[in-house]
Amino acid sequence: MINRSVLKIPALVKPLVQALVLVGCTLGVAQAEVGNPRVNQLGYIPNGDRIAVYKASNNSAQTWQLTHNGSLIASGQTIPKGSDASSGDNIHHIDLSSVTATGSGFTLTVGGDSSYPFSISSTTFNAAFYDALKYFYHNRSGIAIETPYTGGGRGSYASHSRWSRPAGHLNQGANKGDMNVPCWSGTCNYSLNVTKGWYDAGDHGKYVVNGGISVWTLLNLYERAQHITGNLAAVADGSMNIPESGNGVADILDEARWQMEFMLAMQVPQGQAKAGMAHHKIHDVGWTGLPLAPHEDPQQRALVPPSTAATLNLAATAAQAARIWKDIDAGFAALCLTAAERAWNAAQANPNDIYSGNYDNGGGGYGDRFVADEFYWAAAELYITTGDSRYLPTINNYTLERTDFGWPDTELLGVMSLAVVPATHTNSLRIAARNHIQTIASTHLTTQSASGYPAPLSSLEYYWGSNSVIANKLVLMGLAYDFSGNQNFALGVSKGINYLFGSNVLSTSFITGLGTNTVAQPHHRFWAGALNSNYPWAPPGALSGGPNAGLEDSLSASRLSGCTSRPATCWLDSIDAWSTNEITINWNAPLAWVLGFYNDFAATQGGSSSSSSSSSSSVPVSSSSSSSIIPSSSSSSIQPSSSSSSMPSSSSSSSSVVASSSSSVSGGLRCNWYGTLYPLCVTTQSGWGWENSQSCISASTCSAQPAPYGIVGAASSSSQAANRSPTLQLSANATGFEGGSMVCCTLHINGAASDPDGDNLTYSWQVISGNTVVASGSSSSASIHVSNQRGYEVSMTVSDGRGGVATETTFVSVYFSDYFPGSSSSASNINSSSSSSSSSSSSAIVSSSSSVVSSSSSSAASGGNCQYVVTNQWNNGFTAVIRVRNNGSSAINGWSVNWSYSDGSRITNSWNANVTGNNPYAASALGWNANIQPGQTAEFGFQGTKGAGSAQVPAVTGSVCQ
């Protein structure tokens, strides 16, 4: 996304219509301005925010008029709002929420000033959604962009040969394409075929870090449609006009796969040093100039060394892809999951491979020195997809701090996936994630309400890519609406879209081709019509980076000097203003996501427009600034972290996001918050709080809302008291069993529930293996036979018949060797009544449990509850992990293990344990992983040099292993 080239041809001037915006035109003695009032230049939806912004010279209300195709249909008075800090403008608001007319050809006037024309329709943004998605096909690498596919999806704009081009970097030109790209000189001795993927931005580089968040966003758009709205038709096969249309797979998945296959190809092959890591990026070894089509690139290209950040981007997105393609293309899904797990193990072994910045000649850096958030994101995606509890410690021990996201800040990507994707083993994490998103989105509404123009940005947030910061915040608001039904979140999205499409200080639509006065000269090597008529201008739908007070390029710095006191004005529409006017995949991805959400919201027509100048349109938020999503290791309820003895209050500086089915904090009284019922807080005096494991609203804040909202119910009348949900405690464990043809184990399920209102309760439970329900029932307890070695998810729901429910989920690991360890080992967790068996059957089980487990990617030897696994090996090195599993019925508090090598192997570095010694070796728990609950596993790893031959698999000993 970063290009530092010198342009040799002056940029063309803006069209005349923009000149009119800047200098105005004289009508009589008064100077009229076109583009003031500032409106969304595409238009509005009937149930969205419809406030226009008028730049005025004073604070006196003025008369506005709305015409429709020349006929006056409404008028009113502007609402003075005062000076806007980010723009320096004195502004008024114009509220059009009472207008019921729809169609095109609307214009607002104040005195002699007039807006650009706009529409009001529920379909206003349908085409814009497909325009934004089309950006990705146009920027594909390794394929010819053909004329029939250059037009937008579902006819959003017409195809044209001017946007077609030969395949880029595909076995042609001086660099011979991306089919056999070597490593940067002196960094490795192999080459990779990395022909696919998307060109990142104005340059022709392809970056795993920035590509990761981009492909994740498109896949999350799909998962939202799959799991929340059910509206997959919008991105279905045939919707986007791409070469794969008609293959039976959703077009958005075909487009995302083009990038995903590139990212898979960037993984270091097996047998090489740092196998499983991902190369940070691939690009030219020197900067090229503009204009330049991809197939004209004269520069050699090279792979930049692997980084931990890139590797975790691969782990996260490949895990996400694995679950999406599982029922579409099982082979591709398996390939993705294998790559994701390899990447995770490699990142664990190389946690400090931070991009050095020594390879930035020819491409952007994307250096990220803090990768704990990437570890969290990858762990969340892998846990959602696999249910493997080894990823839980990373999730449990990470403190959420950020309120927005971007390529270097990815923790919220993990939170959003946990919130969107349903899985039995993530039930409580999902509840907590949804609450966390609503809390963050509320802070953005507060910021937005303080801005004169409808951007959810403070004056300090107008930096490189500020428009993408807005788009990302709108994603969070959109999900908050999905989870709560609170109209304020949807209206926040609406306001942000209004800003991007023209309701801003510059009266400019920042999306190419969409509006009357739009960005025309984005920084892009191929869409360089501003420099050379042999190259095309940009097609509709590309999002400009937007105002940037940093002014990193020389043209912006010289033309915009003095703008920094009014940072929202620091933008220049010139192809060589790369710090303010570049375009890139990670900016267009959230634009597409937000427009998809907005079209869903527009289609509902369920809520009336709540446009208002009142400050009550923002959702109150607690003052807590950081939080953790922490699942209990012994049950599915999310509990406070062990470092805190009480639930966090709204005034704390750090808090744990928790979820519970506990009863209301305030008895029968509730707050009707714009159609959604919330409990009233007991101790929180103002705004929103967090009490008794759930969100609540203070009485003062709730009572200030207009009718019919506000406080409802009556605590003094039991007949009117709101229903309180039951509580549930679930436990599950496995015991050994042999009899007849059934060998192994019995899974015992026990639920204990109570209801504060004394309601009769009904139970339902199910046992899930992978994605298959292997047993279900409607009792409070059960015992079932299981015959496979694997992890089982046990879920139980209790209902009071009046809408109150409680759900608990727990995880039980079943391994035959745990229940039939052989005569030389002590058998634990086996009931005496089921311990007798025939010698032949027992012998078969002992033989099975004592064998060395092996696969193409790892080998392992069991030692009771301890397992040594080689995760990778190359010429003279290896990585391995030791897993300590608790198969008992009580927690393990502290553990240590020992092992030694007989072939000369040596350990060079380790993670997740205190490893000491020099053969033999000892490892002990760290504070955070010392406690292992029943059925759970602690895992640590290390890297070392091999002795002779293959990496040795030694026995692991220690009291915890027996």
Swiss-Prot record:
The protein's superkingdom reads Bacteria
Q: E.C. number, please?
A: 3.2.1.4
Q: Which organism is it from?
A: Cellvibrio japonicus (strain Ueda107) (Pseudomonas fluorescens subsp. cellulosa)
Looking at its record, which EC class is this enzyme? hydrolase
* PANTHER family, per the entry: ENDO-1,4-BETA-GLUCANASE (PTHR22298)
Q: Active-site positions, per UniProt? A: 203 (nucleophile), 523, 573, 582
Family recorded in the similarity comment: Belongs to the glycosyl hydrolase 9 (cellulase E) family.
> Hey, what's the signal peptide range on this chain?
1-32
Renumbered to this chain, region (Disordered) spans: 608-651
Cystine links in this protein are: 671-702, 681-696, 866-961
Domain CBM10 residues, every copy? 670-699
Name of a matching Pfam family = CelD_N
Q: Which UniProt keywords apply?
A: Carbohydrate metabolism, Cellulose degradation, Disulfide bond, Glycosidase, Hydrolase, Polysaccharide degradation, Signal
GO terms classed as biological process: cellulose catabolic process
Domain called CBM2: residue spans:
859-962
State any single GO MF term: cellulase activity
- What's the catalysed reaction? Endohydrolysis of (1->4)-beta-D-glucosidic linkages in cellulose, lichenin and cereal beta-D-glucans
- Protein name per UniProt: Endoglucanase A
Gene for this chain:
celA
The protein's matches in InterPro entries, at most eight in alphabetical order, are given as: 6-hairpin_glycosidase_sf, 6hp_glycosidase-like_sf, CBD2, CBM10, CBM10/Dockerin_dom, CBM10_sf, CBM2/CBM3_carb-bd_dom_sf, CBM2_carb-bd_dom_sf
